[in-house]
Amino acid sequence: MSQTKGRVTIPTNLDVVPETIELMKRWGADAIRDCDGTEFPEELTKTGAKIYATYYTTRKDNEWAKANPDEVQQCYVMTAFYTAVDKELSIPLMKGISDELMMVNTRDDIKRWWEVIDRSTGEIVPTTNWNYQEETGCVVICDAVPFHEYTVSFLAYIIWDPVHMYNAVTNEWKDFEHQITFDVRQPKTHKYSLERLRKYCEEHPYVNVIRYTTFFHQFTLMFDELKREKYVDWYGYSASVSPYILEQFEKEVGYPFRPEYIIDQGYYNNQYRVPSKEFKDFQAFQRREVAKLAKEMVDITHECGKEAMMFLGDHWIGTEPFMEEFATIGLDAVVGSVGNGSTLRLISDIKGVKYTEGRFLPYFFPDTFHENGDPVKEAKENWITARRAILRKPIDRIGYGGYLKLTLDFPEFLQYVEDVCNEFRELYENAKGTTPYCVKKVAVLNSWGKIRSWGCHMVHHALYQKQNYSYAGIIEALSGAPFDVCFISFDDILQNPHILKDIDVIINVGDGDTAHTGGSIWENPKISSAIREFVYNGGGFIGVGEPSGHQFQGHFLQLADLIGVEKETGFTLNYDKYNWEEHHDHFILADTTKPVDFGEGKKSMYAYAGTEILVQREKEVQMAVNEFGKGRSVYISGLPYSFENSRILYRSILWSAHGEAVLNQWFSTNFNVEVHAYVKNGKFCVVNNTYEPQKTTIYRGDGSSFELEMAPNEIKWYMI
């Protein structure tokens, strides 16, 4: 008998007390939370439910922020590129940036912490050759080289918390005060924040869980003068800086800091950039310092008899949950927003906490809950997409956020959430405490490794980008597939070549000369030799997009010999190419029902002699396979997430690992239906991922099979 209560968190507000109690019963919620812009009703403190209180370590105390303007949080910003036409060039610092969001920091030594760069040469402009005119807000370069480009990198105070600004703009809030972001890392605010936290805990005895949002630096989020989003990087570190922090960094690493280590030519070290040594040093420093201070807060929380939960997002930069420092914080739980399977695994794969929680969509905001809105559609898509990943690695709880009042006019939505809550509880009871059956071990190889586990190709949280959906689809497919998935970096291979011995298949996915494929790391023969040796001795390799892409020593794809495919960059147009014959009857394509969707695909890819082309379009290879020694490789130009493409990736992994013989084990012949086996628990489930009825043949672990018809979205549980 499945549980009918528990493992669910519900939001509330002062104006929905009876409705909260009613929905707690319907949804089986055992925890209640507040949200940004809401207050917790006293009446609900006596319900017996666990009470979460959202706690902002860096805002919601403007009195302190205004009294200590020197300890307001800061961000490194680079101006646009400006071309000099004569010896003098004036560059406006705040052009394109909301002056409600940021204010130029002139309090600290600008000649020490700012940087003017000649972008035509990459050279630093001497500090004697420029000055800042505060009345105009411009840096004036007095000895510019005509027709060279210049930029200014400067520090700015974050005078309106970016998340508060986003919430205010999205919800059209009126008559409110902008919340200023203060820096808990700095001495006065550090001391004050610990006292403030202890006082809060003492004044809120009814609160069981402090839901920290978060520790302590906002991911990079900038808005322009029209309050439109200008720049976003969910992993961005550029708002985790101050002279105080940077001086500490200098002492630790033993070399002087440069703004360019953060600015990175205006790319701000986004995850497509191959990270520099200096940036990796800075990340490591931030991880240690953030963990140290976060632990102080968690210790106070525990002393006050409460649990400490961290929200995975907003001011989370430096926590890095997949790195060793995270466990030292001592958190009880992590909660994060679930946008798809990948972002579910971002939460559920975190170690070092007692439980994890996923906040599901839609968020109860007016952008979804309005007269013509369809929250049921969004909720269905969110649940069905995330469910695949939950079945591989369950979170321990689910919840929702926002304004509960908005949902009350949508009875179908309330019913659907009730169904989801019941289904989740059943799923959790059946899957908990065991690792589901894994066919093979797969390693995603890039410059970042485990620090960006499940977040590869993600610019903003789970949002579509035309330029990367063909690659992000690989990660999404893996999030719910029966593989043991790990994320390794090129540095990992250099430090420990034996790391590949436990792996069946390596996947390298992305555009050339990005961190996802490696860039100039391929000039190091230790890397290319290690991968070749791995495959030659029987390993599998799957390359998607421009794997190992970097022009060097006669190749663009540095593993072209292994992959059997190369890119025509123009340098080899003089060579004729004769291998264009397609082989559609391959194991990998056996379940396809239509032409393969490669998303954006890739132009100008051709195959070497001996390579077996599975799909080429207008003499551009989209999919090919190759034998290399005892091993095998698969090339795919792109693979957006879909159920059919998920099956293609599944078969690609099996084929590259010589695993064709294990295909019919815990397997569904219909790719819209998937099988997950929990052998230790003696159970397996079959899940219909679509909104239509499905028919399929299900294979058990011993190869025996049975026919099955399934209702839309249905999940069926069986004993092994």
Model region roles, listed by residue range:
Residues 1-23, 27-30, 160, 164-174, ...:
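Boundary/entry segment of secreted carbohydrate-active catalytic domains
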Residues 462-487:
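Short helix-loop-beta junction
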Residues 494-501, 523:
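Short amphipathic alpha-helix with an adjacent loop that forms part of the alpha/beta core around
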Residues 44, 62-65, 197-198, 208-215, ...:
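Hydrophobic targeting/anchoring helices
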Residues 69-328, 346, 432:
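Polysaccharide-binding and catalytic clefts of secreted carbohydrate-active enzymes
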Residues 221-224, 231, 405-439, 479, ...:
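Extracellular ligand-binding/catalytic regions of CAZymes and related secreted enzymes
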Residues 518-594:
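A glycine-rich, often tryptophan-bearing local segment used as a flexible ligand/cofactor-contacting loop or short
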Residues 9-10, 15-50, 196-213, 326, ...:
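Catalytic domains of carbohydrate-active enzymes, especially glycoside hydrolases
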